């Protein structure tokens, strides 16, 4: 079996008898295979020549293939052709040849070019509508319906409608809907176009181009390439800048540049083409001249011949529509180089007076104004401003430029200073302007420089008091008393007012809390260096009968030698040891002793600060009847603080109603900054600050070395309910002190809230504790008697002590030198100065009316701060 299979497989005679099967002809070779005759079963058909598919026969072969693949109509048409193909080879070839040779006949069956021309189509379009339609009738035009009825593409209808819209014969309603106006507005728009063309000197441009064409005998291509720069150069020499290419009127139809789509629209070009007919003296315009003028207006420097011919073709379309409107007709102009096609104006004659009325429709006075305004709008939209170069810009770049300009406008219009609040400065509720806070450091520095240039003077500054108080007599100082100088009234809601011009560098900030409607103030005081003053014997703080509370704070600087202060007690009833507080009954006696002369002089509000450590006294020739307590302020500045944080420590205590002059509720405030004066919300006799006006403040200032200044509020500042007091922020204090040169840049001031304070009666004064220099001086803190504290509590007067930011040294026996800093951060070791003690140096100090605290030297160093 295997041998038989092998024999069958290798039998050559059987192979010779077998016939090779024919390949199935593909669809592309079906015609050739059918045409070829059958020469016998053994012959192999000739293979048709294969054509490489990489390179198409024509440039549009691939495009046709893609279109046939996408368009179902073309694909179906090809399929139908394939179905109707006759498989008979010779007959199919004859049919194909007949179809090829009958191409002209097929074109003859289609509409001719003349029938498809825009002019004929425009005639058909205009025949559908009357020349002067009735405005009461609906005259809307749907372009889709018109294109379907006329059996043309819609774009052909758009070409007609754009030219008609340029003459205001139609107006656009929607994307493909227009309203037919006919020739009602034709004369009016022609008058406007003529006047605008005369203003832009179109006639002179036409004459200039004709003159150059006569002079230059070149062909159209050469003349076009050479005449443009020649004309531009000669127009400047002839003194006609309006005809220069850069300044020739262009198009400005709400577009970014003249090369945009709207500027090249058929509507704008039609208006300019009609304008050329209206302004030319022989109203004959060739398309070449019109194309040159319109090309120059486009400000295109690199136009080639193809663009110029494109412009001429567009003008031909416009001319066909205008010819259908019987406005122009085609003529030929004979020139040296031959005949040239041109068009002659056959439309209505337009009078040179543009204000002539339209003969068709009656016009009123309002119509004349509307006509003039329409003329201006047309001139503005049709022609650009002179002397404004235009550049090509893509719409995406327009949006980018607009966004950049808007950002630049926002940056330039942004306020460079803090916002100002516009309120009446005269009212009590006016808010200070924040913009001056930014200039605070510069103003203070300038004032300090001015003051440093002047010689040091001891000036007594007296500010005008309230209406019911008299002026306070000046105090003589050991260094030749100077005449009084009235400081400027602190009427402005914000500002820097020097309390005393003195070129001293250190400063003590004093916080003045205001009412909730206002802001806090900080007084930066500059203590003097050398001289101190003590009031003469017999002087005691005078109390104004009309006030509801008083505050007397007197602080003395202690001596390093620890002198015995018993010898100083008979000299002055106000010189006290540190830490002694006046009991209630004895202080009332002191008030009664001075009440009679105080009533004679009128109610006076003052505060006394003295320095008993230096043992300097007032001059003996001071008048005795002037028993007026004065506040001795060094030079300083009143600085309002608009942004403050509320103090964490505030205490309130209702006093007994046994005294009719006392207000029911008062609160005492302690400052977290060492060296800052705490202020009571009750009225203090030392200083009177009405709301947003510091004029009633009386400051009798002498160059004393002080550590704290009593500050008070007026009745306007007192409220029936307690409110938190604001504390200046650290940034404001550090910024101001550093720019004033008061502290070094490395030193930072902390203004965080300090420990709470003990409740105090409104009749008890606010007590300020000032740090003392522990390195050079040892202070003696006199201790209060417990019996005095109990006596004050039984009388309804509780003892008050402010939260000091540093420990107060005790008596020299047990005192330990503690490193203290000028500005201490809150939370350090504290000791209430008003704590009841048992050690007193003498019995005379128990009858004193003020609390004296040892003073330290105002020396600030970075080591102390850290």
UniProtKB/Swiss-Prot annotation:
Residues 543-552, 794-805 have a biased composition (Polar residues). Keywords: Activator, Cell cycle, DNA-binding, Nucleus, Phosphoprotein, Repressor, Transcription, Transcription regulation. InterPro entries: E2F, E2F_WHTH_DNA-bd_dom, WH-like_DNA-bd_sf, WH_DNA-bd_sf. GO terms for molecular function: DNA-binding transcription factor activity; DNA-binding transcription factor activity, RNA polymerase II-specific; DNA-binding transcription repressor activity; RNA polymerase II cis-regulatory region sequence-specific DNA binding. The modification Phosphoserine is found at residues 71, 102, 413, 417. GO terms for cellular component: RNA polymerase II transcription regulator complex. Residues 409-429, 532-632, 794-837 are annotated as: Disordered. It is found in: Nucleus. Residues 588-603, 612-624 have a biased composition (Basic and acidic residues). One of its GO terms (biological process) is negative regulation of transcription by RNA polymerase II. Pfam families: E2F_TDP (PF02319). Its main location: nucleus. It comes from the Eukaryota. Residues 825-834 have a biased composition (Low complexity). Residues 113-182, 261-347 bind DNA. Atypical E2F transcription factor that participates in various processes such as angiogenesis and polyploidization of specialized cells. Mainly acts as a transcription repressor that binds DNA independently of DP proteins and specifically recognizes the E2 recognition site 5'-TTTC[CG]CGC-3'. Directly represses transcription of classical E2F transcription factors such as E2F1: component of a feedback loop in S phase by repressing the expression of E2F1, thereby preventing p53/TP53-dependent apoptosis. In contrast to classical members of the E2F transcription factor, atypical members contain 2 DNA-binding domains and regulate transcription in a DP-independent manner. Both DNA-binding domains are required for DNA-binding and are proposed to form an intramolecular structure that is similar to the winged helix structure of the E2F-DP heterodimer. Belongs to the E2F/DP family. Homodimer and heterodimer: mainly forms homodimers and, to a lesser extent, heterodimers with E2F8. Dimerization is important for DNA-binding. Interacts with HIF1A. This is Transcription factor E2F8. The gene is E2F8.
